[in-house]
Amino acid sequence: MTLFVVINIIVMLGLMALLYMMQKKHVSFSKRVFTALGIGIVFGFALHFIYGSSSETITQTSDWFNIAGGGYVKLLQMIVMPLVFISILGAFTKLKLTHNIGKISGLIIGLLIATTAVAAAVGIASALAFDLQAVHVDQGQAETMRGAELEQKSQDMEAKTLPQQIVELLPGNPFLDFTGARPTSTIAVVIFAAFLGIAYLGVNRKQPEQAELFKKMVDAVYAIIMRVVTLILRLTPYGVLAIMTKTIATSDLDSIAKLGKFVIASYAALIVMFIIHLLLITFSGLNPVTYLKKAFPVLVFAFTSRSSAGALPLNIKTQRSLGVPEGIANFAGSFGLSIGQNGCAGIYPAMLAIMIAPTVGQNPLDPSFLFTVIAVVAISSFGVAGVGGGATFAALLVLSALNMPVALAGLLISVEPLIDMGRTALNVSGSMTSGLVTSKVTNELEKDTYQDRTNIIEAEV
């Protein structure tokens, strides 16, 4: 370890101490995260220009910074499966009207899939409007390595037929899926939790005493898991600082500049899709301004943390402040982690498909091709994880199904973190919109709670 590496680590520790002081002074969580984001960008640029992105000093410094950044991501990954499982199961135990459960879950899943299909169409329109093509993107060493890695993953997936892939969604060994060992582990855990939830409803009708005991156990575990999530989320400012510093310091800024058009096109599509969410809320007879005010804190958190799973507790609390019953809020938030993510599983893979199409001789304006892309994107949106890598998995599924070279998806590695922030915020907005619209359609929405504009949930951890 050189003197310069030691100095860089000391500076990072000093910046973390500053964030800790802000926490002690009770500065709001959102402000602390945004401060960490800003400081990380500035510090990253400073390191980049002083040492150079490929220098030995930066390589060693990044390894040390990764203790905070990578450690934070690992902790989020640790809690995802227990969080998804207990949230789905808790949704069943918290439902007060059990006769509507099929309609409620069907509506939520239907809305998530439908909005993902719309998101795919928006992504296609944006890619065509900005004339995005993979042949216009330079391929450096990092992009080539990433492409080879994606190619290997794709080959592993292509070894199975479509019926076999559908069977793979089922939890043959739920304990294995709790480890996240398979690409479809998330949706498998959702299915397992749903089976337990349905079994609970049956026992509740015939043996209410045993069901009540099970409910208390689930509620207790739910409280413990949510507390663990809170403990992990307290590390968010430090994790964001380390991740952004490392990302900027090690990035090829020339590549980012060249991919600027893709970043702009992505955010244009994300904004259009967010407006569509607001239109859905408006057509449901609700004031979209109220939704914006109440949803802002959780969307900011999702944007800065880049974790739909980490945002789940705040997502559910925000839905409750919007008048969504607790059971529906749990369903919408939990399903939204693994089904129909508008940003990661909708817009992103659709844009990639349009970009790559000309390289394989496919006309991206062919109507039959466009409809195929939308259908494949919607179907493939099952099982996308809510922590890092979900968009990549969705892209692999879609491109493999369309017989396109997945290696070209590696060309976007340098701008992935920039786009992922917006995608995550849209994912969370999509799950909240599905819960809100479902509550309104089923007449379960507490309108007085929705209209109470003072009831705004802040991210407090």
UniProtKB/Swiss-Prot annotation:
Molecular function GO labels: L-cystine transmembrane transporter activity; symporter activity
Highest rank taxon of the organism = Bacteria
Q: What is the predominant subcellular site recorded for this chain?
A: membrane
InterPro entries under this entry?
Na-dicarboxylate_symporter, Na:dicarbo_symporter_sf
Spans traversing the lipid bilayer:
1-21, 33-53, 72-92, 104-124, 183-203, 224-244, 262-282, 337-357, 369-389, 393-413
Query: What is the recorded function of this protein according to its Swiss-Prot or TrEMBL entry?
Result: Mediates uptake of L-cystine, the oxidized form of L-cysteine.
Write down what this protein is called.
L-cystine uptake protein TcyP
Q: Which organism is it from?
A: Bacillus licheniformis (strain ATCC 14580 / DSM 13 / JCM 2505 / CCUG 7422 / NBRC 12200 / NCIMB 9375 / NCTC 10341 / NRRL NRS-1264 / Gibson 46)
